[in-house]
Amino acid sequence: MSPKLAVIAGDGIGPEVVREALKVLDAVEAVHHPGITVETLPYGADHYLSTGITIPPAEMQRLGRDADAILVGAIGDPRVPGNEHARDILLGMRFQLDLYVNERPARLFDDRLTPLKGKTVRDLDLVVFRENTEGLYVSVGGAFKVGTPDEITIAEELNTRKGVERIIRHAFSWARAHGRTRVTMADKANAIPAHALWRRVFDEVGAEYSDITRDTRYIDAMAMDLVRTPESFQVIVTGNLFGDIISDLASILVGGLGMAPSANRHPGRVAMYEPVHGSAPPLAGKDVANPMAAILSLAMMLDGIGEEAAALAVERAVRAAITAKVGTSDVGGTLGTRAVGDWIAERVRAG
């Protein structure tokens, strides 16, 4: 059976960057013939505002059952100030489909893209594995006496042994499979007693991987060290909130959010791929958005469905574009969104 890809272009610049990713997928089909069936879904702000529906529960179940992968552009629109549709679509997929692995690679394709003096492509090639279904994002808590001087808000952080163990084990397994020799865990165990669970499980699981060095950092120290000595890190594993923050920091070190792809996975099930950047409504329709994060997310999708050669071809085409200074203004280029997508697609076709 042919692999099935569901596409949610979303809001703002989402449709523009997804358009270019699908253009590159057409080039992949012409050369590598993976035979991927693409289904475009309407969900986003426009759909929500016209129907009152974010994404039907039955649709979520269908995606989990029938799709091999989901590609999302970006979700978020100022016309929906409560962000209900983004919460239901993005967090809904992560939680309801149990996509507990958030994989965010940060790889420098050209020395000129990093703001760090003296650092090169040899110093910046790391992956952040973020626990994607627990932590502070589970919305346990609430508010009391809202709008009064006595207002109270509470947010509980949820950490289960199962959740902590499976993301840590995934990080070590990935490191071994990809020839990485060090896994670093970030927490705040010196100030948050619950993070002792992360430390215990990290040591227990790490002991099963004697070929891999393990170390731990407090998250504030890691933020400093990631900027000062990024070459110290190969694989980072951490919780939901810290992973969200540290992966954004890592992305700016390799060229910005326009170069930052991501995958949301549960091995053996459907996976969701998306550029890390947001919907950037002020940029929508101006042909200025960098499509490379979406295209690199496509490459991660291809790798995830077993099309390793096609994934490598896409990644090489993006690298060639950066080397040739073909890009949007955020990476030092002069081209628009469409032209960048055209160039990368033609590079893939050329082989």
Residue ranges and their predicted role:
Residues 6-23, 27-31, 148-220, 229-232:
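Glycine-rich phosphate/diphosphate-binding loop of Rossmann-like nucleotide-binding domains
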Residues 47-49, 225-326:
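Glycine-rich phosphate/nucleotide-binding loop
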Residues 111, 217-224:
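Short acidic loop-to-helix transition motifs that present clustered carboxylates
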Residues 66, 139-185, 189-191, 209, ...:
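Glycine-rich phosphate/pyrophosphate-binding loop and the adjoining helix
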Residues 21, 25, 294-302, 344:
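Buried hydrophobic packing segments
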Residues 48-154, 241:
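N-terminal glycine-rich phosphate/adenylate-binding segment common to multiple enzyme folds
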Residues 11-14, 68, 129, 171, ...:
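Buried hydrophobic positions in well-ordered alpha/beta secondary-structure cores of metabolic enzymes
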Residues 31-58, 226:
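N-terminal beta-loop-helix "entrance" segment that forms/cooperates
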